[in-house]
């Protein structure tokens, strides 16, 4: 239910911000006709996120998963109940005004906050509260993508730090329920459709895929270092941190003016890439510009998920 409400809110803000329409229908910022005014929209969204973080909770900044891990490791899995509504609202504003993020990080953070809050109300042990936090977080991911197995693996690797029946069973049940919710609210279709007649890979193709995996692994390390460098650069600015998301939003708007496909969630970009309908020039442009927009915006400390943009890149 929370996942569906978040998607509705993102679509509503996207329609209002880029098309002046009070509608909850599916919308992408890529088809806007705002011209140079498109630079202002993400900046205004970033400004609102900064205000929410300043007056609400600084914990809404970031993409959700590291923040959940931090609470598990340092705060006995206790997350402020206010994050339950502040995180999805701030993320919807960020994404709906053109932020190059996905909805998976915010829903993971929101589900984790719901589980943690329930655990605090029930007065259970820290370990049981950790399981509830992980169950809520991964149920959220399963609800967005309809991929319970991937969500369970995420919980084991990033949130539970263990593989035992006492934690695996409740998390698995939560993920299955989240997946059922996905099919109920979003339909039976897959999130990213592909051609059914994919040919078997040749030996040369398998070698290329292996090489590509190594290259992407190296680039992943470089990406992490670049984002950290951008975060450090923002910390050196002579302005309060609440202004950083607005500054990052200006960069997002400038990039979005030249390549509108970089704006918003961009699930349609992944679908187009899988179908092979984009030219090489568009693919290279999207990869480079989406990375610049995402890295600067994330480094500015705004709110949004990273999985969808990284899948695109």
Features from the language model and the residues they span:
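Alpha-helical transmembrane segments and immediately membrane-proximal extracytoplasmic
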Residues: 1-313
